[in-house]
Amino acid sequence: MERQHSALAMPFASPNRTARVAILLSTYNGATYLSEQLESLIAQTEQDWVIHASDDGSTDATLEILYQYQRRLGDDRLYIHAGPRQGFAANFLSALKRTKDQADYFAFCDQDDLWEADKLERGLAWASAHPTSTPLLYCSRTRLIDSTGQLIGFSPLFRRPPSFANALVQSIAGGNTMLFNAAAAQLLSLTPFQVPIISHDWWSYIIVTGCGGRVHYDEYPAINYRQHGNNLIGSNSSVRDRLVRLQRMLKGTFRQWNDVNLEAVSHFRQHLTHENQRILELFGSARRAPLYRKLSLISQSGVYRQTLPGNLGLVAASLIQRL
């Protein structure tokens, strides 16, 4: 599933290219599952890759494991960097800024998942069919596994097309599924470090769609997303998960997230397409408008979530000043 936007030509060059794909691995006290993840990267059917591991100050055996694999793979295939120690989103952004000229494609990677062997191959097959000057972002559904690697479910299957109007109010895929091209990397690397973002995956979806890129949502689960004590997201489709989202809305968390995202997007306004500037303005106006105008402006903006319950929640959030 994808949505085509008017292309934004982003000039880029890779004079320091070291591989077709740069895998951006963020680590922090991830020794328990890190070796399994690294083995799944090594087993990829696409082998033209390098790993850039950005460690955010681990105090367990994470760095020791990374150095063991560096000795095995060579320091020209596994690079180890010190992260900024400002949270996972900043760590990924730092890794991207550091490597943006060194590959044709980039893939975010968490420390505790397991990639399917064809994960990179699937993303590259889609991306390579499109112009390199267009920002491209591939993402997918996920299998959910427990701490022992047993299947426990799947992330939601979304059917509606990806777009900026959707991205403003919903993130449809985890960063651990994402692969993007150099044009998208150059674009995302313009994000100022001092600008807070909620998460690197939601931010990537917002910016690539907003600036005229293409996003493809693969219904095939390309990774096994591990759920454990430090990383529980749930299937996102159960009654419990819906109640959690309702509680967040009532507490104002959704509104706070929108505040952060809209402030960050304001720094990219000149890069947005004219149509997406219009959507952004209408959505912002809807959030500020008196009650009797809110729903009309929401409708005019065209923002939407992927499901009927999600869109009903969007209306409810608007009516109770939690948008």
Write out the residue ranges for each language-model feature.
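C-terminal subregions of glycosyltransferases and related glycan-biosynthesis enzymes
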Residues: 193, 197, 203, 224-323
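Nucleotide-sugar donor-binding/catalytic module of glycosyltransferases
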Residues: 2-237, 319-322
